[in-house]
From Swiss-Prot:
Its cofactor is heme. The keyword Flavoprotein does not apply. The 4 large subunits of the cytochrome b6-f complex are cytochrome b6, subunit IV (17 kDa polypeptide, petD), cytochrome f and the Rieske protein, while the 4 small subunits are PetG, PetL, PetM and PetN. The complex functions as a dimer. This is Cytochrome f. It comes from Morus indica. The chain crosses the membrane at residues 286-306. The keyword ATP-binding does not apply. GO terms for biological process: photosynthesis. It comes from the Eukaryota. Keywords: Chloroplast, Electron transport, Heme, Iron, Membrane, Metal-binding, Photosynthesis, Plastid, Signal, Thylakoid, Transmembrane, Transmembrane helix, Transport. PROSITE patterns: CYTF.
């Protein structure tokens, strides 16, 4: 009986240890690999500043292209696709938080007009569902359903992201009108260079904080370097810490200047933003246009028939 209790206690302790380890892993890993859309959500009420700049550019410093494709016009209460393309060389590898090389992730923020929102699952067609695959979209804020974020997701699989969007109906939403509206998009590939608190990530260039002579370079056990710089004028020592990832460009005994790069730039990613326009079309206006075109076609047909009839009359009179 005592042996059974002992075995049960050991089993419970092992399960508890595994659970605690898993929780610690999730907490410590999330800010490194899965948190960069959350950085913007936590720090900014609106992802688009008054200047038109999307705040993701504050952390992703390199400028890269992004493209968005939407229909020219949509009818009310209709599901349509907004396709965001984040192009990059799929062979590229980025510096991860631990200093090793790995594949790039991508992410995007889509800023829709007020009233437009993510389409509910029961309104999405099988064709669009196939394009979406396993992607999970979320609102930037519970109160901002027109702003959607996605990522990070594997760039090799999702460099093209399809958002299923539901257009509003002015008949039920009085603040929505049949107009032309702008749509804004931001898309990044790879990790950022700056964290929200202003500190550098290891996906960045590290510069000398002092001029002088590099007197000592210590390679740290877990990667990275400690570089000691001695000021030639007063002998003051400054130690610059380089995290794992960037490649060192200086050597011991080398004379360096203030702000001189100590490392290469490991960043291969970047952020881009773009915009598009979409018209919320009034169905009555479309019907009116179709009727107008139909009337023109009928008028042309009657005109041709009348002309042929007139020609026949003329021909018969000439024969008479």
């Amino acid at each position: 009986m005592q042996m059974r209790n002992t075995f049960s206690w050991i089993k419970e302790e092992i399960i508890r240890f595994i659970a605690v380890s898993l929780i610690i892993y999730i907490i410590t890993r999330a800010p490194i690999s899965n948190a960069y859309p959350i950085f913007a959500q936590q720090s900014y009420e609106n992802p688009r500043e008054a200047t038109g700049r999307i705040v993701c550019a504050n952390c992703h410093l390199a400028n890269k292209p992004v493209d968005i494709e939407v229909p020219q016009a949509v009818l009310p209460d209709t599901v349509f696709e907004a396709v965001v393309r984040i192009p990059y060389d799929l062979q590229l590898k980025q510096v991860l938080a631990n200093g090793k090389k790995g594949a790039l992730n991508v992410g995007a923020v889509l800023i829709l007009p007020e009233g437009f929102e993510l389409a509910p699952p029961d309104r999405i067609s099988p064709e669009i569902k196939e394009k979406i695959s396993n992607l999970s979209f979320q609102s930037y804020r519970p109160t901002k359903k027109n702003i959607l974020v996605i990522g990070p997701v594997p760039g090799q699989k999702y460099s093209e992201i399809t958002f299923p969007i539901l257009s509003p109906d002015p008949a039920t939403k009085k603040d929505v009108h049949f107009l032309k509206y702008p749509i804004y998009v931001g898309g990044n590939r790879g990790r950022g260079q700056i964290y929200p608190d202003g500190s550098k990530s290891n996906n960045n260039v590290y510069n000398a904080t002092s001029a002088g002579i590099v007197s000592k370079i210590i390679r740290k056990e877990k990667g990275g370097y400690e570089i000691t710089i001695v000021d030639a004028s007063d002998g003051r020592q400054v130690v610059d810490i380089i995290p794992p990832g960037p490649e060192l460009l200086v050597s011991e005994g080398e004379s360096i200047k203030l702000d001189q790069p100590l490392t290469s730039n490991p960043n291969v990613g970047g952020f881009g933003q773009g915009d598009a326009e979409i018209v919320l079309q009034d169905p009555l206006r479309v019907q009116g246009l179709l009727l107008f075109l139909a009337s023109i076609i009928l008028a042309q047909i009657f005109l041709v028939l009348k002309k042929k009839q007139f020609e026949k009359v003329q021909l018969s009179e000439m024969n008479f």
